[in-house]
From Swiss-Prot:
Na+/H+ exchanger which mediates the transient acidification of the coelomic space and plays a role in contraction of posterior body muscles during defecation. Probably by regulating the defecation motor program, required for fatty acid uptake by intestinal cells. Residues 19-108, 154-159, 228-235, 284-299, 372-390, 412-424, 486-492 are extracellular. This is Na(+)/H(+) exchanger protein 7. Signal peptide: none annotated. The lineage of its organism: Eukaryota, Metazoa, Ecdysozoa, Nematoda, Chromadorea.
Amino acid sequence: MWIKLLFFFTTLLVSTSGLGDDGITALLDPNSTEFSTVLPSNNSEKFSYMLASVKNMNMTASEFEEFIKVLKHRQSKDHSGEHVGNEHDESHGISVVSWHWDYVKNELVLTLFFIVIGLFKLVYHHTFVTRKILPESCCLIFIGIAIGFFFVGDATHASIKFLEFKSKVFFFYLLPPIILESAYSLKDRAFIENIGTILLYAVVGTILNIVLLAAALLILIWVGIMGKYNLSVMDILTFASLVAAVDPVAVLAVFQEVGVNKMLYFMVFGESLFNDAVTIVCYNLAIEFQTLPDFTWYHGFLGLLSFLCVSIGGLIIGLICGAISSFVTKFTTDVRVVEPVVLFGMAYLAYLGSEMFHFSGIIALIACGLFQTHYACCNISYKSFTSVMYITKVCSTLCESLIFIILGVMLVNEREWFWTDWHPVFSAVSVVLCVVVRFGVTFFLTYFVNQFTGGVRHISFQEQFIMSYGGLRGAVSFSLVFMISANPDVKNTMLGATYAVILFTNIIQGSTIKLFVKWLNIRLAKKEDHFRLFIEFNNGMVQHLSQGIEDLCGDKSLSLINRMSELSKKYVRPLLEKNYTANKAKKEGKLVELNRAVAMREALNNSPSQSSFQRQHTIDEMAESGALPHDLLDEEHQGHHHHGQVHPDNEDADQRANELIKDVSSIRQLMHNPFEDCYLDRNLTHEEEKEQARLKMKKTRAFKFSSVRKTIGFFGKKKSVRRHATQQGILHSAIATIGVQSVDRPSTSTRVSVEDEEQGLTMKEMEEEHPLMTITESEETSF
């Protein structure tokens, strides 16, 4: 029998050159009479004979299926090389120019899409009218709809095969960069102080949204207001779970443009991030409940345990991967280029590991990203930190844009129009209930937050309205509805309602959120910056008074966040941070640091060469917000000051300074030396050593500035006296600033600039010697 089978297999491989997947699938049923219609005409009789031979071999069904699988695998390999093979067969020589469209079609079109996304963002942000009317996500959906109409006649999707939505591609390639970039952006004091409120909205609020929305839909269906539908209780629960996912991309963009206060921004941002994780867990539970014959309270209890296990398991895996990445980056001083690889690799490993154990990959990725920003980023260099932040931002932006374009394409380029099987009443009621339930749950939970929790400050009615109105639906809801494996009628009903919810929230609510932010007079971050020093001083005084009262009463209580911070400083940071000491965080008072940042910001805003300091101003803001360690900031300052220093030789310092001031090319060379950015060492091994050497050399050169003065002695003998020239040293330190101002302004202003720079350096020395006096003067000025 095996000899016959081998002969049959060989003959079949030779004769399957024109056989498609449908033809091979037809062979799985030996009694099928339709296999001859899908086979080539010249091979029909041959396959009939071979099929009869298979029947005579007495093969079992499992053996036959295994044989067909091998045949399919062999055929796929043959077809994969068919294009190249045909070209080699047809070509009879060396071709100078050839056309390989089928070989690079998908990759080329995808690359063009990325370029189009970049050009669209450039045009969008330079078009004031479009940016004022529509959010960016709406414009991307419209672009996808236009592309879908262009290929609307292609029923097989062959032209836009790469734009077909696949849930695995979304959850393994498009969603992780978005979640990781969001996790990296959450390192802020406002997020840490409001973590309890954010989790309350994300966990309890999401569950309440699902339960209330499902209950309202069931009641309306039971009463008969919406008519009769073939939707079961579990189908309604699944639909409520998938439309509860919040994706406020447009809202956050408006918040950044308007400049709302940090508390409102991070509450909406953090709630939407954790909301996605809770929504996916609840959706998976609803899918598992559908497979049960009868739902009991015992199954509900198991579902609650599964929810806790999935969430806690993902949290543990994320923390473990974050700790490993932080520990590994302690030893990357000699190989700086691997630092981004370690951070990205461990973060993605946390996501995949959690999914492998059926835990929440989103929770694992959030935990790993937050852990890396607090510990691993303290070990990496400033260039690696900048690379990590920019790479995640670019990938996140591309993935978000591609998701919205795919949403628009699939809206009009489905196998059937989405409105052929949709129910307008069900979709309209779903949209209204999503908005109403969101408002009700937000106001209900905010009442308890304002009454019974120790929040940082009261959440006003205007902010509650914006938080409720900003509950847009997007990519997660769109992806989850495609994963439903119910009957076509049920899936099309849910798909049409989900499309209606996504389009309404993004187009209507996303377009009007900016108007509500302005009309409701939401508290902005700029108003808080004017009194920030006073607020910090007031909070510190209240905290010290509270500690004193607690000591007198004998009852000392610390919040959970403070206890976690103390444990981190005592045990975790010495283990995971490089060169960490207990007094590292206390080397400078908080008020002194904040006052220096405020003074620097005011000086940069009042400087006529403000545009030249735009990059440094951004670095200062990152350091103040905690996104950039101050040690890295000091290294950056060292690098910039080095550009302004000139090694004084034996020639006169004043003459050399005047030549530098008059020569624009020398000034530009001092401000930006292209050879400084080139690293011959690909591993960036000696980066920190170079920075330390530059700082040491700068201090050494400061003592070499001197001038020679000729005097006459008692007996008329001339002699030369060399002494330190402080004015010349200050002039050399100010060369960079003078150069920038000399390019932008006439040369008559250079003397004033020198005097301002000397005054600034004098104030800086006074501040270093008497920091308390500087704080007092700054406070008197602010009052």
